Amino acid sequence: MKKGLLFIASILISLFLLSAVAPKQGNDPWIVPEKYEKMKNPFEANKESISIGKSLYSQHCKSCHGKEGLGDGPKAAQLDTPSGDFTTKEFQAQSDGAIFYKTREGRDDMPSFKKKIADEEDVWHVVNYVKTLED
């Protein structure tokens, strides 16, 4: 009986320790539906759009993604998953529709902005702004 309890306890401890070092979900590829991958931004990336996007970014995104979009905002260190760096070639290579989808839907520590930025037009302006943050 003691051996059985000892065995079960060691299994539970092992599972607990493994879960502590397992990779976080944010390392998984973020799958964007094809509909959004192909979606075109209906707003030209002009001064007005970028200015609106920058204002919204400062209000809703800067605390995690940082002033320059490097993923180094004051809240980034508290997150379980890395905050995205918008200046990378990988990020900038994404379609506008993919960025729109990720902003609206969120995942893991990245919240959905469907309610905070309810107007889809405003999300497109944020997309135009973050596309200016390339390295």
Briefly describe each language-model feature range.
Residues 102-108, 114-135:
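C-terminal capping alpha-helices of c-type cytochrome domains
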Residues 18-28:
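Bacterial Sec-dependent signal peptides at the C-terminal "C-region" and cleavage site
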Residues 26-56:
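Electrostatic cytochrome c docking/interface patches
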Residues 47-70, 76, 104-105:
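Sequence/structural segment immediately N-terminal to covalent heme-attachment motifs in c-type
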Residues 51-59, 84, 97, 101, ...:
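Solvent-exposed, polar/charged alpha-helical surfaces in well-ordered, non-transmembrane soluble domains
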Residues 82-97, 113-123:
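Electron-transfer interface patches adjacent to heme c in soluble/periplasmic c-type cytochromes
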Residues 9-16:
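Bacterial N-terminal signal peptides
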